[in-house]
UniProtKB/Swiss-Prot annotation:
Its EC number is 6.3.4.20. It comes from Bacillus cereus (strain G9842). Homodimer. This is 7-cyano-7-deazaguanine synthase. Keywords: ATP-binding, Ligase, Metal-binding, Nucleotide-binding, Queuosine biosynthesis, Zinc. ATP binds at F10, S11, G12, G13, Q14, D15, S16, T17, T18, C19, L20. InterPro entries: QueC (IPR018317), Rossmann-like_a/b/a_fold (IPR014729). SUPFAM superfamilies: Adenine nucleotide alpha hydrolases-like. Zn(2+) binds at C186, C195, C198, C201. It is an enzyme of class 6 (ligase). It catalyses: 7-carboxy-7-deazaguanine + NH4(+) + ATP = 7-cyano-7-deazaguanine + ADP + phosphate + H2O + H(+).
Length: 220
């Protein structure tokens, strides 16, 4: 894969930034694509742009505001509370988001001569999002190949690892401090360790604490 090109679906968060570093190591050329769907905090787009610029990665931002018109939710509406009731999809789930993002990433990838698409979706820390499942990604990969008669390969480096292992991967890639200090995971738009209270921050912190304990134990 070292001679090939990849497009990374990039939000500027922990997972997609780890995937960006993974792609940089795996491929000869990497581009990043970020989607503006009127998310709760526009800082996410700014954060992604800054990271891409710092890493020297060509970065494209695509307007997906139509998604907010079709599927208003807690990620795009400040007047909706972030909730997750047992047996129901989280209020942060955006219908069709990964379906559309990966489809548009594929269109871009073909235009720039890339076969490979990298995304940070994950089943292990499954948050109730059906479009983060491996079966969905594999199905969409086949559909995209058929729809454009092009041999795409969708890579999901985080699919079977948890948040602690994602921190470990960033460390192995030499990006641990970068990811910890410069990425935006927080639903409230606070870069780095975030607000510490929203579900995204809690999941991120739990994984970080577990990994740091494991790393300290391994060094003793």
């Amino acid at each position: 894969m070292k001679k090939e090109k990849a497009v990374v679906v990039f939000s500027g968060g922990q997972d997609s930034t780890t995937c960006l570093f993974w792609a940089i190591e795996q491929f000869a050329e990497v581009e990043a694509v970020t989607f503006n769907y009127n998310q709760r905090h526009k800082l996410e787009i700014d954060c992604a742009a800054k990271i891409a610029k710092e890493l020297g990665i060509k970065h494209t931002v695509l307007d997906m505001s139509l998604l907010n018109q079709l599927a208003p939710n807690a990620l795009t509406r400040t007047d909706m509370e972030i909730t997750h009731e047992e047996g129901e999809l989280p209020s942060t789930f955006v219908d069709g988001r990964n379906l559309l993002f990966l489809s548009f990433a594929a269109v871009l990838a073909k235009q720039v001569g890339a076969r490979h698409i990298v995304t940070g979706v994950c089943e292990t820390d499954f948050s109730g999002y059906p479009d983060c499942r491996d079966v969905f990604v594999k199905s969409l990969n086949v559909t995209l190949n058929l729809s454009m008669d092009y041999p795409f390969v969708i890579h999901t480096p985080l699919m079977w690892i948890d948040k602690a292992e994602t921190w470990k991967l960033s460390d192995e890639l030499g990006a641990f401090e970068f990811v910890r200090e410069k990425t935006l995971t927080c639903y409230n738009g606070i870069i780095g360790d975030g607000c510490g209270e929203c579900p995204a921050c809690q999941l991120r912190k739990a994984g970080l604490d577990t990994y740091l304990q494991e790393r300290e134990g391994a060094n003793n």
